[in-house]
Amino acid sequence: MADSTSGVAEAKADTLREQHLQLLLEIEPAKRCSCPLAGPDSAVEDVHTQLDGDVCHAEVTVGDGDASKVVHATTSVGDDCLCRAFAEFECVPRIRRADGECIVVETYLSDRAVITDLVERLDELTERVCLRRLTSDGRGDSTESKTATIDLSSLTAKQREAALIAVHHGYYETPRRTELATLAEALGISKSALSQRLNAVEAKLATAVFDSE
């Protein structure tokens, strides 16, 4: 699927910034979400969107049997607009899949600290947000998280922050690329406090895995 979706409230052509963090998010839209991707009639293959004030113009390519068709949708942009939420943090959402149940979005950020704020904002607008992949590239040590899907909506803000920094710095890789003390120093907390947060995260994720089986 081509990189296609763009939604930026205000153009800032004079601002250039390397976006070296790649996120892949799985989002379950709110029940009354106005986005045309929240309830497509068929599987979405490609999306192009353009925000014009409070109006969203979308051209959605959907599967239609053995063929495909392009559907144009014009909707009023509400407070639940996902494109606007991404634009608040100066990143562009790229729709990778939408099937009526969830929307898979890829985006890039320049600062790890923004991840938590972005996820918290999306969590306010949606039923559920899951981080499927966190990748760091463009810095000479490209590494991709090998962990399973993390349901971020089940974690507290502090647990979410601890989980994200642990994944990003390779704490759960084998062998580990960082130590607990280094992560605790980066967060400005004690090793014991970080250990408690990560233990709580791991317990919640383990419970979620068994509950889904």
UniProtKB/Swiss-Prot annotation:
Give the Pfam families listed for this entry. Answer: DmsR_N, HTH_10
Record InterPro entries: DmsR-like_N, HTH_bacterioopsin
Keyword Plastid belongs to the record = no
According to the entry, every stretch annotated as the HTH bat-type domain falls at 155-206
The biological processes this protein is annotated with in GO are: cellular response to dimethyl sulfoxide; positive regulation of DNA-templated transcription; positive regulation of transcription by RNA polymerase II; response to decreased oxygen levels
Explain what the UniProt record notes about the effect of disrupting the gene for this protein. Answer: Cells lacking this gene have no dimethyl sulfoxide (DMSO) reductase activity under aerobic, anaerobic without substrate, anaerobic with DMSO as substrate nor under anaerobic with nitrate as substrate conditions. Cells are not able to grow anaerobically by dimethyl sulfoxide (DMSO) respiration. DMSO does not activate transcription of the dmsEABCD genes induced by the anaerobic conditions. No effect on aerobical growth or growth under denitrifying conditions.
* Reported induction: By anaerobical conditions and dimethyl sulfoxide (DMSO).
Q: Name one GO molecular function term.
A: DNA-binding transcription factor activity
What keywords were assigned to this record? Activator, Plasmid, Transcription, Transcription regulation
Superkingdom of the source? Archaea
Its function, per the record, reads: Involved in activating dmsEABCD gene expression related to dimethyl sulfoxide (DMSO) reductase. Required for anaerobic respiration on dimethyl sulfoxide (DMSO).
Question: What's the protein name?
Answer: Dimethyl sulfoxide reductase transcriptional activator
Read off the lineage from the record: Archaea, Methanobacteriati, Methanobacteriota, Stenosarchaea group, Halobacteria
